[in-house]
C-alpha cells in the first residue's frame, strides 16, 4: 500500500471458515518477515485484519474495536476468538525499536506456543505503518461453509490443541435466540450437526472446558439464503448506551453502567430483571481484580473456577454461570459479551434470578468485567 490511504473495499467473504490455513510464501517486506518470525506461526486469515489496521493507521484513525477485527476475521474465514491487534507508525520505522515494541506487547500472552499471527504494512503521505494481529489457537476447525440454504444441515468438527474435559456448541440464530446443540467429544475432537432452520445470519461458537474453565475456542458465521454483510452491524452492539464513561469514573460506577446494559438487554428480550446481590458482587470483584493483576482473561485465573469461588465464599446455587470480558470501555465489554452466543445465553437465561457485577480499571485504563449469575442462591 502506498500513495493515498483510501478506505479499503468491504471484505469479500470466503466460501469456508477453517484453520489452520498457512500463508502462501513469505512477506516481501523485511520488517514484516521479522515481525512474523517473532510473533509466531503465520495464519492466512489474519492478514486481512492486519491490513485493515494498517489502513486505519494511515488514515489517522484509532485502532479498530474487537468487533470490527472479528468481522474482518470471519469474512476471511479465520475462526479464532479474542484476536488482538498491535501497530506502529511513523515517518520511518526502526526495525530494532519496532521489534522491541512488539516484544513488549507479546509479553502479556500467557500461551505463546498456541499463538498464530498475521502481519501487514503500508505507506501513505510519507507515513509508514505496520500491524500484527494475533490469536491463541486453542482449536482448529474443519471447513465450514459461510453460505447455506434454509433447511441445510451442517457439520461442525473442531480439533482441540489443548487438554479439555469436554465442550459445548452454541448457535445464535437470526432471531437473536441462542440454542445449545448436543456434541460428541472423543478427548481431542468435538463434532456436531445443526440445521439452518430459517433464513438469516447464524453465529457458531465452540466452547472448550479447559484447565482454566470454559473458553470460546472457535467462532464462525454462516448465512442462510442471504448475502453476508459488507460491514459489521453495530460492532455486535447490544441494546445499550455505548458512550464511554467519563474520565475518572470509579469502579462502582462502571459496574452500575454494566448493570444498566445487562438490564436493558434482558428487558428487550422480554426476560425479567435480575436482582443485584452484594455477595455475588464480592465474588465477581475478587475475580476481576485477579484477572487485572495478572492481565489474564480466564474463568480460572489461579483462584479456582466459578463454582469453586462460590463455595469458597460460602455460597451455593441451584445453577450458576459467569461471563468475563476485557476491553477499552464497559460498553465495548458488554458488546463483546452480547455478540458471543454462549455469553448471550448466560445474559438471557430465564432461570437465573440473581447477578453479581464487577468492573476493574487497570493501570492502562482498560476494564476487566465479570458477571456472576445464579439461581436459588443460598
Protein language model regions, located:
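Sec-dependent N-terminal signal peptides
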Residues: 1-5
Amino acid at each position: 500500500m502506498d500513495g493515498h490511504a483510501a478506505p479499503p473495499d468491504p471484505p469479500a467473504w470466503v466460501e469456508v471458515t477453517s484453520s489452520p490455513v498457512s500463508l502462501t510464501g513469505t512477506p516481501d517486506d523485511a520488517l514484516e518477515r521479522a515481525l512474523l518470525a517473532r510473533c509466531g506461526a503465520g495464519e492466512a486469515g489474519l492478514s486481512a485484519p492486519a491490513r485493515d489496521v494498517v489502513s486505519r493507521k494511515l488514515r489517522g484513525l484509532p485502532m479498530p474495536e474487537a468487533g470490527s477485527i472479528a468481522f474482518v476475521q470471519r469474512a476471511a474465514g479465520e475462526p479464532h476468538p479474542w484476536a488482538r491487534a498491535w501497530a506502529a507508525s511513523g515517518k520511518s520505522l526502526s526495525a530494532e525499536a519496532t521489534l522491541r515494541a512488539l516484544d513488549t506487547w507479546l509479553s502479556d500472552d500467557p500461551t505463546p506456543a498456541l499463538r498464530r499471527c498475521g502481519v501487514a504494512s503500508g505507506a501513505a503521505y510519507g507515513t509508514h505503518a505496520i500491524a500484527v494481529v494475533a490469536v491463541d489457537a486453542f482449536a482448529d476447525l474443519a471447513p465450514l461453509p459461510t453460505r447455506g440454504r434454509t433447511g441445510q444441515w451442517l457439520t461442525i468438527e473442531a480439533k482441540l490443541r489443548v487438554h479439555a474435559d469436554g465442550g459445548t456448541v452454541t448457535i445464535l440464530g437470526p432471531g437473536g435466540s441462542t440454542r445449545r446443540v448436543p456434541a460428541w467429544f472423543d478427548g481431542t475432537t468435538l463434532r456436531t450437526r445443526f440445521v439452518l432452520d430459517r433464513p438469516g445470519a447464524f453465529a457458531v461458537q465452540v466452547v472448550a472446558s479447559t484447565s482454566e474453565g470454559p473458553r470460546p475456542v472457535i467462532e464462525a458465521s454462516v448465512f442462510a439464503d442471504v448475502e453476508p454483510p459488507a460491514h459489521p452491524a453495530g460492532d455486535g452492539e447490544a441494546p445499550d448506551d455505548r458512550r464511554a464513561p467519563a474520565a475518572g469514573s470509579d469502579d462502582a460506577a462502571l459496574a452500575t453502567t454494566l448493570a444498566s446494559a445487562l438490564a436493558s438487554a434482558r428487558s428487550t428480550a422480554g426476560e425479567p430483571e435480575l436482582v443485584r446481590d452484594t455477595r455475588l458482587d464480592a465474588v465477581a470483584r475478587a475475580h476481576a481484580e485477579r484477572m487485572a493483576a495478572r492481565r489474564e482473561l480466564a474463568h480460572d485465573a489461579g483462584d479456582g473456577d466459578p463454582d469453586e469461588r462460590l463455595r469458597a465464599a460460602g455460597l451455593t446455587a441451584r445453577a450458576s454461570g459467569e461471563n468475563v470480558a476485557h476491553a477499552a470501555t464497559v460498553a465495548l465489554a458488554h458488546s463483546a459479551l452480547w455478540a458471543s452466543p454462549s455469553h448471550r445465553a448466560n445474559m438471557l437465561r430465564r432461570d437465573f434470578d440473581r447477578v453479581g457485577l464487577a468492573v476493574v480499571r487497570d493501570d492502562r485504563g482498560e476494564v476487566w468485567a465479570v458477571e456472576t449469575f445464579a439461581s436459588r442462591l443460598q
